[in-house]
């Protein structure tokens, strides 16, 4: 049987065995609802709050209650964008984002437009960079939120979040960042980034699918999107997924403990992969290869070929890659990220994403 090689870690990483072990007691032996007052419920509450405190400390949060557990990156992005905009609608109805955001942010922004908000999508340059001056020019007196990703999920290009946040805060506008791809890969601490809200997801770092969190700085108003009980301090109704919270905290601890060594290893593998491909296939280009980017991500443009055909051929040969966000991979639309970078249509259509992870080896890259 042909060996299969997984090169789509930006879409999702396998559950780490150590994380599974941390979740096992909760899955099999802890029946309590964290909102119940009996002994089982109190025990569940202790475990939930320990996970919250641990994750908050890893993020550099001032208080553990700034961490809201959710079902993943999409819910975190929706809660941040819609929650802040609607909570601050009495102060204005203008939101700023970028043209290269994850579909979760773009869809939430589109929903705001239907509700009467104005949304400005900032442009990026040909390498995927965002100039803070663009943000400065876009801010208006009625701007109530800036939502800009930390690292692009397709190209890996990193935005200069501290500089962008400083521009927004000078105008007293809160900042949300989608750090789903960057958390655990590069340094991500809210005091250093200067953001007020931050989204992260467990299944990108070896945690369970369906786990995630939204950091919300104390004092930031947030209109809940799920209504019902008073869980998560009335910011997200519904019985907390204790196993997911425990797994997310465990995955985050492992990812941060191993981050520096793993980033150096993956960066070397990525550079080797790009060099080998360009040696073997003339004309292959790296999209967004100039600016600082995530160590595990490579977006490659192949001349004279359609990405869909290439992905099928690679899959048949045993290589799992993608054309972009897994949320959109079933669609045949060209990448909105590469189009926003102003790349020629034929280059956009011939581009694929290769993303490495904890189990990727030098042997696999050489294959």
Regions found by a protein language model. Name each.
Residues 1-367:
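Pyridoxal 5′-phosphate
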């Amino acid at each position: 049987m042909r060996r299969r090689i997984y090169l789509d870690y930006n879409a999702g990483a396998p559950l780490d065995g150590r994380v599974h072990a941390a979740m096992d007691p909760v899955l099999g032996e802890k029946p309590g609802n964290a909102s119940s007052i009996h002994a089982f419920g109190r025990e569940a509450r202790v475990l939930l709050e320990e996970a919250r405190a641990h994750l908050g400390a890893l993020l550099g949060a001032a208080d553990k209650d700034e961490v809201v557990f959710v079902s993943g990156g999409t819910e975190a992005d929706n809660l941040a964008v819609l929650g802040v905009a609607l909570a601050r609608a009495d102060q204005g109805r203008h939101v700023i984002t970028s043209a290269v955001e994850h579909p979760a942010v773009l869809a939430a922004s589109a929903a705001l437009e239907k509700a009467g908000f104005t949304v400005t999508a900032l442009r990026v340059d040909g390498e995927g960079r965002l100039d803070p001056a663009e943000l400065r020019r876009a801010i208006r007196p009625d701007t109530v939120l800036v939502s800009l990703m930390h690292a692009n999920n397709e190209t890996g290009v990193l935005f200069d979040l501290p500089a962008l946040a400083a521009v927004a805060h000078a105008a007293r506008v809160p900042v949300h960042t989608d750090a789903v791809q960057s958390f655990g890969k590069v340094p991500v601490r809210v005091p250093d980034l200067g953001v007020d809200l931050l989204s992260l997801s467990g299944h990108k770092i070896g945690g369970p699918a369906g786990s995630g969190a939204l950091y919300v700085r104390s004092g930031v108003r947030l209109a809940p999107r799920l209504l019902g009980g008073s869980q998560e301090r009335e910011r997200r109704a519904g019985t907390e997924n204790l196993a997911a919270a425990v797994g997310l905290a465990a995955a985050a601890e492992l990812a941060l403990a191993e981050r520096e060594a793993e980033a150096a290893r993956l960066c070397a593998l990525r550079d080797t992969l790009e060099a080998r491909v360009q040696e073997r296939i003339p004309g292959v280009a790296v999209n967004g290869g100039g600016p600082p980017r995530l160590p595990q991500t490579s977006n490659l443009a192949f001349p004279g070929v359609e990405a869909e055909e290439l992905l099928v051929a690679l899959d048949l040969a045993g290589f799992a890659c993608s054309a972009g966000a897994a949320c959109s991979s079933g669609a045949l639309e060209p990448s909105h990220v590469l189009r926003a970078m102003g790349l020629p249509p034929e280059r956009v259509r011939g581009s694929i994403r290769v993303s490495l992870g904890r189990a990727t080896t030098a042997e696999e890259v050489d294959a």
